[in-house]
């Protein structure tokens, strides 16, 4: 038995080394959000294969606390669009995927097996949401590796109550992410990212000085398109565009209220 285990380990190591040589990471380095898609259907076999592979993501206790609702029909996309602020890609993408934190399925399994579930609480929602988001990112990476384009819609948690109603989500199921998917019909400029040293912390978190912030955000603030945003919005700094225009406190507080209400409605909060 020891010899068999050793042989299996050696084979696994060889496979990993082979895979490492073959993997081309350029698609990740060059990735960008795609909002315009060709009117070309995604084969169900491909979509199902990508989702099945995505489900290999890490999951709490191997419970797989997520479900995915696939939307293809134009009338269903039209119903979802207002919940996503009528962003055009919701209705023009061949496929819209709603990833949900789901303790409904697992809880029903428990009850069917003489076990009493206790997952109607915030910590359970966070665990299920983490599972769902890990799967979401896994799917996005796999989809892009197969030549598809994706757009991550942050609006899902802004209007979860509407999505719950439209998709008929039962108790202990909560939408946490929406992805539009299709074959790209555009090649937009790649968005900027903060420098590595602005994000990494060795051993402990090192809080930022004003000088650190100046250095980390210098390139972002110097970009012509970002300077244009400042000008057209009649603001003094790029940060003000975020705080005063794009992500305002009043909006955040209102949507937080909707989120809390929906979590309670779906059984994750008292």
Residue ranges and their predicted role:
Residues 14-270:
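Acidic, surface-exposed loops and disordered segments
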């Amino acid at each position: 038995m020891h010899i068999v285990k050793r042989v299996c380990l050696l084979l696994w190591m060889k496979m990993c080394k082979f895979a490492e040589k073959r993997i081309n990471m350029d698609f990740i380095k060059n990735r960008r959000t795609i909002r315009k898609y060709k009117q070309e259907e995604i084969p169900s076999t491909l979509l199902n294969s990508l989702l099945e592979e995505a489900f290999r993501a890490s999951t709490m206790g191997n419970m797989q606390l997520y479900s995915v609702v696939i939307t293809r029909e134009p009338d269903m996309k039209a119903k979802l669009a207002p919940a996503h602020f009528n962003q055009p890609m919701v209705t023009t993408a061949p496929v819209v995927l709603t990833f949900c934190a789901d303790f409904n399925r697992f809880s029903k399994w428990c009850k069917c097996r003489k076990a009493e579930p206790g997952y109607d609480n915030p910590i359970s929602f966070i665990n299920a949401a983490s599972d769902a988001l890990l799967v979401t990112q896994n799917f996005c990476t796999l989809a892009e590796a197969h030549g598809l384009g994706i757009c991550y819609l942050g609006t899902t948690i802004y209007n979860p109550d509407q999505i719950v109603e439209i998709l008929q989500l039962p108790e202990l199921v909560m939408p946490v992410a929406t992805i539009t998917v299709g074959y790209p019909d555009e090649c937009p400029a790649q968005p900027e990212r903060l420098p590595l040293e602005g994000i990494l912390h060795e051993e402990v978190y090192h809080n930022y000085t004003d000088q650190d912030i100046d250095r980390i955000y210098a390139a972002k603030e110097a970009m012509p398109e970002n300077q244009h945003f400042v000008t057209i919005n009649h603001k003094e700094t790029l940060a003000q565009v975020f705080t005063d225009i794009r992500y305002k406190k009043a909006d955040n507080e209102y949507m937080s209220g909707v989120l809390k209400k929906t979590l309670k409605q779906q059984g994750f909060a008292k």
